[in-house]
Amino acid sequence: VICIDFKSDNELSVSELDLNKLQFFLGADNYTNQQLYLWLNNYLDSVELVVGDKFYQLPNVSFSPVGFKQEESVLPYSPNSSLAYRVLYEYFCYPDSFSFLDIVGFSKLSSNQSCSEFSLRFSFSRPLPSDTKVRKSALRLHCVPAINLFEHDSENIVLDGSKSEYLIKGSHQHPEW
């Protein structure tokens, strides 16, 4: 069983939850990512929403792999190029862009219960391998596949975590850019 806890600053009604908008990034080591990907896509047996002392079975919830549809490509492609070629090319160049999973099949619940914390419990039809170490960083929210397609150098920036956005400037060594 994998249990993921969520906490909100505001009270939420269970009936307002829309988990279909959740996308997870598998952010562990390669082996753990591959095992989680396999188990979440193939061996997921049941999903439960836990709110306080109440348990809601979510029978239609599953995971959908991200990165295979044309609109999910991370590189520009012409519309007449083969989708299979694009997927292979991107997988070999940027395998992490295929480490995303969407929750699908969540139906609104008819409950007036409100909460600021809830959990999702994922049960599997077989146990995860004993050498798979699932830590907090294994399933991440708010991640996007980002690839720098800019063909020029930029000035260095200091990523100290003090800001959420950084201005990137072209290199002063090449003023023609």
Where are these regions (language model features)?
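Short, low-complexity Pro/Thr/Gly
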Residues: 5, 11-177
